């Protein structure tokens, strides 16, 4: 049995700082997802302005407790309008939340302290208040499309103050 690889000290050597999105392996690409679940919330688009509005209604496959997909490998079959993120489309999708690791790296920015690749802990996304845990009102299977306007919220498009800090706060 081999020892687990050591995390680099500081942030030198982290792949997202040295590789383009196109150069990343499949595993590296997938690890850019912080597991917040914000992209799995239903969104509405204003037909006149093109503005995007988040709701606190989750996709039918969103596990609101873990903030992950209940059937990730088959999500496109079960949810045909599920958008698969690619290096090309993360640069153009205007509805990705400001905290999105894919979006940050595509823009040449660094990941936040709470991103699991930086913290080494998948729970820091919840600790920082970035995830949808405890904030999903219901599933799209429970809330009719006609009622979605009643569920518009602003928080998914905002970054909590705690999450904007340069490093993990000491409690």
UniProtKB/Swiss-Prot annotation:
It comes from the Bacteria. InterPro entries: Puta_zinc/iron-chelating_dom, UCP006173. Coiled coil: none annotated. It comes from Bradyrhizobium diazoefficiens (strain JCM 10833 / BCRC 13528 / IAM 13628 / NBRC 14792 / USDA 110). This is UPF0260 protein blr3103. Belongs to the UPF0260 family. Transmembrane segments: none annotated.
């Amino acid at each position: 049995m081999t020892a687990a690889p050591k995390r680099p000290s500081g942030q030198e050597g982290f792949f997202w700082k040295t590789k383009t999105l196109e150069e990343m392996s499949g595993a590296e690409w997938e690890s850019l997802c912080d597991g917040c679940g914000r992209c799995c919330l239903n969104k509405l688009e204003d037909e006149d302005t093109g503005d995007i509005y988040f709701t606190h209604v989750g996709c039918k496959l969103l596990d609101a407790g873990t903030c992950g997909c209940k059937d990730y490998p088959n999500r496109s079959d079960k949810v045909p309008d599920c958008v698969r993120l690619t290096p090309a489309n993360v640069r153009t999708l205007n509805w990705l939340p400001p905290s999105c690791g894919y979006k940050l790296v595509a823009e040449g920015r660094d990941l936040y302290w709470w991103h699991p690749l930086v913290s080494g802990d998948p729970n820091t996304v919840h600790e920082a208040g970035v995830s949808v845990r405890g904030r999903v009102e219901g599933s799209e299977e429970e809330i009719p499309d006609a009622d979605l306007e009643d569920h518009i919220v602003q928080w998914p498009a905002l970054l909590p103050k705690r999450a904007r800090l340069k490093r993990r706060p000491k409690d």
